[in-house]
């Protein structure tokens, strides 16, 4: 209160405590603001430290699966998210890998399948830009969640790039404090995604280097087997096994023309000669028509293909089989056959890199096969040439000299007066005649050795062809030097094949049958059919005859069911030298 322009001393005294109180309030607010700023600075420093630590973690490993899991775990920890996931896709935007965190295995099992790149996830794959949502279900691209999927609301998605190419996306949902993701969260995750891109690229390069090393080793093993003298036809199983291992697939098969010398354009069907994997165990000896568009492109045109579904005509067991690689065995202008690799995984089980690598592997295997086949034929030609030379030498030199010696001894007989000596000279002349006759027989055998191969082939083929009218689909394979099989054993072989095929037609009710004749230290005959299999008790004169023939020849006879499928395998063997 004032009096004559003067301030009342009592009023001044009352204002001083008020000013003091206001000053204290402003100081408290300032201290609180400073404390908040300090906390923000500390929090920012901690988050930066967390980002650096996360970058170090995700770039530390070279295993792709482990690297992806490290990225997801680091991202969820960095922004305090309840759920996290990362997908990796190929150039066709097919999801190849999907790792997740926050969902237990029981829930995953009940959901039944992983995301397929649809909805908001598909949007980020098609348009790789950061996306932050307060309610993911409200987005126009959202298609909802499958049954048993945990509810999710807030969402942050960031593309993972390498050299401006997006090959994956990092997803985070539901901060544990219930708040939406912030601008700072997005910046941090983008920084982590940049490091993740480098880490994934390094892991993929390492994976490709390991795969290429395995490819080199597999190619070397096959070439070594072939060039060491192993029968080329038997190495196809190694080709199928190595193809299975290189691709981590579930099954593989090799199919070749029945006549390897026939031009590819004239081949009507391929014979499945080797399989690896239980899913294809029952189709050995079956044939595949080349009429199908994909198979014809691969075999006739020599173009490797990757398909999401393969339908090989005539093989009902593989109807609508999953992803597959179809690889031509190309070598010097020809295609020796086809390797088919099958996976039970979904689309994208095989990558472009795998197709390229496996096509090169098949080419190298086919080239080694062709070289080995050429070497085998050259060796056979050398043997036949040597036999012709030996036959000529025996005829032109040895027989003539023996004949001259015989004439000389025969001329000396009348001049010898001792009857005992005359008899001994006559016996020697007779022995020389026997030797000459044996040599002539040997010459005939040497000249006929090359025809012997054809004769045995023709006899076996004729024994099988006898049942052509029964509707049985048959294939015959020959492995080894057939010329070393003598006539007696060839007779046995023909009888065994005839009896085995007859049993398959009359008793097994088979529709397909494969005969494999292999000559090594023994003559081995294997007849496989897809019939009813072995009965609980089986008897019959035919089987008894086969067993007796094996015993008389010093060999073995067995009859067993086809492992993992219907049908019977008959094996008969006998040593070459009796």
Swiss-Prot record:
It holds the Pfam family HisKA_3. Keywords: Acetylation, ATP-binding, Cytoplasm, Heme, Iron, Kinase, Magnesium, Metal-binding, Nucleotide-binding, Phosphoprotein, Repeat, Transferase, Two-component regulatory system. Residues 383-578 form the Histidine kinase domain. The keyword Acetylation applies. Induction: A member of the dormancy regulon, expression is controlled by devR. Induced in response to reduced oxygen tension (hypoxia). Induced in response to low levels of nitric oxide (NO) and carbon monoxide (CO). It is hoped that this regulon will give insight into the latent, or dormant phase of infection. Member of the Rv3134c-devR-devS operon. Disruption phenotype: Cells lacking this gene show no changes in gene induction following hypoxia, or exposure to NO or CO. Another publication shows a severely attenuated response to CO. Cells lacking both this gene and DosT have no response to hypoxia, or exposure to NO or CO showing both proteins are required for the hypoxic, NO and CO responses. 95% decreased induction of the DevR (DosR) regulon during anaerobic growth, 50% decreased induction of the DevR regulon upon exposure to NO during aerobic growth. Changing residue 87 to D: No change in autophosphorylation when NO-bound, loss of autophosphorylation in deoxy or CO-bound state. Residues 63-200, 231-369 form the GAF domain. Residues 386-452 are annotated as: Histidine acceptor domain. The keyword Cell inner membrane does not apply. One of its GO terms (molecular function) is magnesium ion binding. SMART domains: GAF, HATPase_c. The isolated histidine kinase core (HKC, residues 386-578) is a dimer and autophosphorylates, suggesting the protein may function as a homodimer. Was identified as a high-confidence drug target. A tyrosine residue (Tyr-171) is required for discrimination between bound gaseous ligands. The Tyr is part of a probable hydrogen bonding network which includes Glu-87, His-89 and Arg-204 that is probably also important for signaling to the kinase domain. This is Oxygen sensor histidine kinase response regulator DevS/DosS. It comes from Mycobacterium tuberculosis (strain ATCC 25618 / H37Rv). The gene is devS.
